[in-house]
Amino acid sequence: MLHVLRPGYAGAVNGHSNNGNDDETSTTPTLYIFPHAGGDATYYVPFSREFSADIKRIAVHYPGQRDGYGLPALTSIPALADEIFAIMKPSAPPEGAVAFFGHSMGGMLAFEVALRFQSAGYRLIALFVSACSAPGYIRYKQIKDFSDNDMLDLVVRMTGMNPDFFEDEEFRVGVLPTLRAARIIAGYNCPPETTVSCPIYTYIGDKDWIATQEDMKPWRERTTGAFAIRVFPGDHFYLNGNLSELVCDIEDKTLEWCDRA
């Protein structure tokens, strides 16, 4: 079962049907899934289906996306992490440990949320970062100060898109949340001494030009534990063609940690 956590709706957790069963216990490890910018939780249903019932999966649904109209716009990665952690956090740390998976922008958010779980005394299994540059190594930093119109102009210049498309209000409303997320991504950083104690395992496509291997290697500086990088064939969304191998690696590392604990 893939559970979906919707910020802005306290206590609302919905389920998507999965091939596994729902025999989770209080000690079952939980994997929180943080989607990419512009992606919603339902995008990760196929990803979730590859896991066994030995791991509980909870995907985070961001404000301002489908079924989330009217919620506050993203202002920063740390602010969104605060909001999500406040909803995730039970009154006391659970018996089961937690792990985090984030793709693209979701990798930054997963890191920030993991820091909050760590400070609150939770047992962290690992942070799994997919196709996401390490803090301080994010490209296109100049766009962090762009207005909405500046962002739309940049899209026209970079893609050759007809600017008349942006005269359509419905089209603007549809595209601006993703562009605003890109602006937030470009402005994200954190102090160099900020680290998690759990291992960080990173994954990247060999043809990814948005987050390259060189951009991801500095994630090793963000953990006092183990670090590894694994390269798959594919582009920024390499995971779509490598679901079984990716999930197998994540599940093996998660359950190995639980066996040792």
UniProtKB/Swiss-Prot annotation:
<dbReference type="GO" id="GO:0008610">
    <property type="term" value="P:lipid biosynthetic process"/>
</dbReference>
<dbReference type="InterPro" id="IPR012223">
    <property type="entry name" value="TEII"/>
</dbReference>
<feature type="active site">
    <location>
        <position position="236"/>
    </location>
</feature>
<dbReference type="InterPro" id="IPR029058">
    <property type="entry name" value="AB_hydrolase_fold"/>
</dbReference>
<feature type="active site">
    <location>
        <position position="208"/>
    </location>
</feature>
<keyword id="KW-0843">Virulence</keyword>
<keyword id="KW-0444">Lipid biosynthesis</keyword>
<keyword id="KW-0443">Lipid metabolism</keyword>
<comment type="similarity">
    <text>Belongs to the thioesterase family.</text>
</comment>
<dbReference type="Pfam" id="PF00975">
    <property type="entry name" value="Thioesterase"/>
</dbReference>
<comment type="function">
    <text>Involved in the synthesis of both phthiocerol dimycocerosates (PDIMs) and phenolic glycolipids (PGLs), which are structurally related lipids non-covalently bound to the outer cell wall layer of M.tuberculosis and are important virulence factors.</text>
</comment>
<protein>
    <recommendedName>
        <fullName>Thioesterase TesA</fullName>
        <ecNumber>3.1.2.-</ecNumber>
    </recommendedName>
</protein>
<dbReference type="GO" id="GO:0047617">
    <property type="term" value="F:fatty acyl-CoA hydrolase activity"/>
</dbReference>
<dbReference type="InterPro" id="IPR001031">
    <property type="entry name" value="Thioesterase"/>
</dbReference>
<feature type="active site">
    <location>
        <position position="104"/>
    </location>
</feature>
<keyword id="KW-0378">Hydrolase</keyword>
